[in-house]
Amino acid sequence: PNVRWEYCNLTQCSDAEGTAVAPPNVTPVPSLEAPSEQAPTEQRPGVQECYHGNGQSYRGTYFTTVTGRTCQAWSSMTPHSHSRTPENYPNGGLIRNYCRNPDPVAAPYCYTMDPNVRWEYCNLTQCSDAEGIAVTPLTVTPVPSLEAPSKQAPTEQRPGVQECYHGNGQSYRGTYFTTVTGRTCQAWSSMTPHSHSRTPENYPNGGLIRNYCRNPDPVAAPYCYTMDPNVRWEYCNLTQCSDAEGTAVAPPNVTPVPSLEAPSEQAPTEQRSGVQECYHGNGQSYRGTYFTTVTGRTCQAWSSMKPHSHSRTPENYPNGGLIRNYCRNPDPVAAPYCYTMDPNVRWEYCNLTQCSDAEGTAVAPPNVTPVPSLEAPSEQAPTEQRLGVQECYHSNGQSYRGTYFTTVTGRTCQAWSSMTPHSHSRTPENYPNAGLVKNYCRNPDPVAAPWCYTTDPSVRWEYCNLTRCSDAEGTAVMPPNIIPVPSLEAFLEQEPTEETPGVQECYYHYGQSYRGTYSTTVTGRTCQAWSSMTPHQHSRTPKNYPNAGLTRNYCRNPDAEIRPWCYTMDPSVRWEYCNLTQCLVTESSVLETLTVVPDPSTQASSEEAPTEQSPEVQDCYHGDGQSYRGSFSTTVTGRTCQSWSSMTPHWHQRTTEYYPDGGLTRNYCRNPDAEIRPWCYTMDPSVRWEYCNLTQCPVTESSVLATSMAVSEQAPMEQSPGVQDCYHGDGQSYRGSFSTTVTGRICQSWSSMTPHWHQRTIEYYPNGGLTKNYCRNPDAEIRPWCYTMDPRVRWEYCNLTQCVVMESSVLATPMVVPVPSREVPSEEAPTENSPGVQDCYQGDGQSYRGTFSTTITGRTCQSWLSMTPHRHRRIPLRYPNAGLTRNYCRNRDAEIRPWCYTMDPSVRWEYCNLTQCPVTESSVLTTPTVVPVPSTEAPSEQAPPEKSPVVQDCYHGDGQSYRGTSSTTVTGRNCQSWSSMIPHWHQRTPENYPNAGLTRNYCRNPDSGKHPWCYTTDPCVRWEYCNLTQCSETESGVLETPTVVPVPSMEAHSEAAPTEQTPVVQQCYHGNGQSYRGTFSTTVTGRTCQSWSSMTPHQHKRTPENHPNDDLTMNYCRNPDADTGPWCFTMDPSVRREYCNLTRCSDTEGTVVTPPTVIPVPSLEAPSEQASSSFDCGKPQVEPKKCPGSIVGGCVAHPHSWPWQVSLRTRFGKHFCGGTLISPEWVLTAACCLETFSRPSFYKVILGAHQEVNLESHVQEIEVSRLFLEPIGADIALLKLSRPAIITDKVIPACLPSPNYVITAWTECYITGWGETQGTFGAGLLKEAQLHVIENTVCNHYEFLNGRVKSTELCAGHLAGGTDRCQGDNGGPVVCFDKDKYILRGITSWGPGCACPNKPGVYVRVSSFVTWIEGVMRNN
């Protein structure tokens, strides 16, 4: 739909025989289409006309612009209103929409039919006039126009009509008015969009007419201010005349009127790339007027201190030629430089080249004697070398005595005699023969290449950005003997500890045999020494792995990972794979890595608009095209390539910064990341990228190139649809490089937190193979998946197919036990079946695994992963063995035959168009058992509800006999697999405890602990007890506990887990918690507490020695400084301290509960939390349905599954609002519910009800004794009951949140109530709905709630509508599940309409009022 028509990819025959076929006369039938709309709207390039002079005499019928747009008719005012009409220009030949030049500009033009582009030049060429005759253009006398001169069309020059200027262009008086980037010039007399002082009044001799290019104040070339508000000025797209005859036009004297503009503001501020100067030697003698850096930044004036303060002033350097902002070299460095106008970049070298001095003469630089400067040596500018001025070193660089002082990442070297920012022992005194002068790169202790300490406090040292000399002549410089003075530095501290990227090694197979000296990771981090425990403690030591070659900090693979790796020196990143490539094994040798020399230029030329290739000019590429450096820039469908340096129309990361060796010049086709052939991003906004229209070169013996195998963390890349991987089982073993989802979205890198924050990182899933952005399955999902780069879609399954195994093509379906996830899978596009392909099924079709996807009425099946058009709960995650693949027909819930949901919104589901197979002895298949949970829904709607963490597994005795599949601890952490040593090394393995049932990561009790436990996947928490409760022994008796005989272990007693006595865990605290002596050690956000006696990661003064009476034991929550509640320092280096996840005790009887005495067995491991009693707050005894439907439309809750729900009623028994029980005597509701009557006697509450009208016998009805409204007018109120409610399995309070806690966006929560259901099923019964928290900033957008949501309110719902609070639900609860209980997060307050699209509900944020709530309850 986006491309109406295109020419075919055909070439014209050569007509080599000299004959040409006369085209036939084509007389088209008259068309009613408007002339400008008739298709096609472009002229064929082969039918090309030409014009003479400037085209005023042109009377042809061409009507297409240089960009292929159709011309607007001259008599039409749509889409552009104008004054070039046949009436105003009677002699202009303005017929229909033909190209014309009515007001003499450079060439014929027209207004376009594109509303976004007013006008363009026509795609015509100038006639050659080879015979020497020229047609005199017509005299066109236009009717006077009222259009402003600056508005007069046209406003661009045609690129084919190019003028030139002499010298610096001061004498130029042409009519060109387009810049080098194609922008239109602003009129010199106009102050819009840029205010300036270059006016005809101030520069009377400057020729400042209309918006023509000029050079009023002598700079390098003609320029102008632009009509783009974002770009003040640019040089014009003019070339310098060749002056081949030796004559030059003397520029006129331009005497400007004095200007008040500051020198640093004087325009222009950039040089035109075509006007390039050069310098001799190191540029000290350079006195040119260039003032642009190598990255295109404008120079700061030497006399200015903004934006950078410095000492290179004309006063301090009187002989340095420091005039205006021209490039200079006042203190001899490598080349001319300047300070920049960019506040973030202090200085850079100028974009100048060194003169060739081909004649053998060189200009002697003047002696520059600067005034003494007070600047510190490390501040002296410049701090970088110009890339074009590159030196080299011989051998390992010990003999190097050059003056280079920049590292491979562009950091400046620290002076060898300086101890700031890094203290070291490589000083001139200790290494007198090493040439440690100033901050020049050196190699004092022979390592791989010259290096230096950096001036960046976070990076100690790096190799220098030097290359090794070729030594082509066969001579090598012998490095001098360097005898350093003995150093006190430890052997392991010896620098350097990283390799230069230029010195690249490779490894074979998985790299277990690698014994090289590389010590840098894929992200450039330095490796930690294997014998060191700083910053990461570990067990991969030379002592434990004597044969693994764990020397110094070199990359190794001691434990059969997929490639060499190391621990890093970054405290926040435990380990990474090394930046090594796998050796390419051939018959005789290892292929060398391809050396790619990129274009050293970073000038603006790389930003030029892309061009198209003629079909006749066809390149070819070798191999996969990584070595291709041609200039082709057209895709296989004829689209033009986007420039690699441009982010329009497609944002990407394939830039020269990330791919410096990829040859990413202009918009040329390249293959920077090892695709199957060269490709590029396209200029079509609807097509992100395509392969280029290039062919592979014929392979000959001399044309085979070595393929680059560089491993990097480059930005992810889409896969070609033709390059498809497959995976085995559930894909946990998949290690391919596919990175595209089922909907074509690009995967987010696992190490990235943008656009989606997550915890699937290599730190938490070290064996998950989470490399780059490749599809993986780290947590036992049904197939490989990834987070997406689309901020609107968190994650999706990958576009991979399951591998076909064995000859019979039967897919092995693994037993998948998924980790519980709160993330909703994304949709997968359904497929259709060919009517001729008919399957059959056995029995009732539960065993059917075919690919049929059409119903008996011919409708297409909806994908099981999709919620469109029908929402449902039959997803692969809940039925892992039911074969719910794509949109194939299945029968996983014992229907009479296979069926599916349909793509027809009006038909929810139908049986599939399958027949039953004839029953024979060989055709009977074993039907898998798929047992759904019984439901009150219609059979066709049944779906098993999610397993709620609230209704838990249980164990008998001490849990040694437990063989369940629970794998979550009491704090919600995932268990580590018993056979894994990551992140915690241990000896509780299936081999050592063969009878203990140590399967996968399931909770077990192999060594007679108090109850089942496991090691956790959190590196900061070694082990915890599991979130299990003890079974009631009255129901089924005590199971016999098996005897577990462990294999003798060498583990020390202090390492054995668990070894301490099960602590008594206090779940609540009294007052402000100063008396709390429980063993809870987790904060409100789930972080683990830091030990009070530890100074890592946070240093503090709350130690047992300083606070001897506060019982600062281990890492237990305490309140040593009379804060508002118990707290602790956290193990997260980025979060110093937080309040603990404890609630205040109710103290309803008025007595203070004495904390129990806890006498733990001494242990080095922090204890964990014990499961609490069954009637604790937020823990219903009936499993909630957690229906994803809406209140409007009906989803009846399971009776008593939301036991804190209150029906607030009048004294006559009429329900009018909801409420939440938060303690036996207190109910929380909305203040708006109490507006009618202020007396408490008017209200009563109903507890434990499921039906609104016919109340059950167990319901509790209690009068209200007091009302408390929030004092500042928030929509929240407290009701005190006349007597305490009786807490039963049907009446349980909800838990209050921590004060001021802000719940994260997209958290799943639930609302409940008996409110208005608009006539849908289930009216009068308690209903529930799932909704998501939405950020207030999103809700406050003008298209949603337009700034009406306050910070003390939270927004939740579905922007598409369908789920919301309604009249009658006000005051009711919004609860969210957290770890093992439901927390009250909101009170239903207000919202425009009921379940309306783009109008989510608004709820009172309870955490903002916890202090007020607790104060009222405490004082009343």
Swiss-Prot record:
Disulfide bonds join C50-C127, C71-C110, C99-C122, C164-C241, C185-C224, C213-C236, C278-C355, C299-C338, C327-C350, C392-C469, C413-C452, C441-C464, C506-C583, C527-C566, C555-C578, C620-C697, C641-C680, C669-C692, C726-C803, C747-C786, C775-C798, C840-C917, C861-C900, C889-C912, C954-C1031, C975-C1014, C1003-C1026, C1068-C1145, C1089-C1128, C1117-C1140, C1217-C1233, C1309-C1376, C1339-C1355, C1366-C1394. CDD domains: KR (cd00108), Tryp_SPc (cd00190). Residues 49-127, 163-241, 277-355, 391-469, 505-583, 619-697, 725-803, 839-917, 953-1031, 1067-1145 form the Kringle domain. It is an enzyme of class 3 (hydrolase). GO terms for molecular function: endopeptidase activity; serine-type endopeptidase activity; signaling receptor binding. SUPFAM superfamilies: Kringle-like, Trypsin-like serine proteases. SMART domains: KR (SM00130), Tryp_SPc (SM00020). Residues 600-616 have a biased composition (Polar residues). Residues 19-46, 598-617 are annotated as: Disordered. One of its GO terms (biological process) is proteolysis. Its EC number is 3.4.21.-. It is linked to Elevated plasma concentrations of apo(a) and its naturally occurring proteolytic fragments are correlated with atherosclerosis. Homology with plasminogen kringles IV and V is thought to underlie the atherogenicity of the protein, because the fragments are competing with plasminogen for fibrin(ogen) binding. Belongs to the peptidase S1 family. Plasminogen subfamily. Disulfide-linked to apo-B100. Binds to fibronectin and decorin. This is Apolipoprotein(a). The gene is LPA.
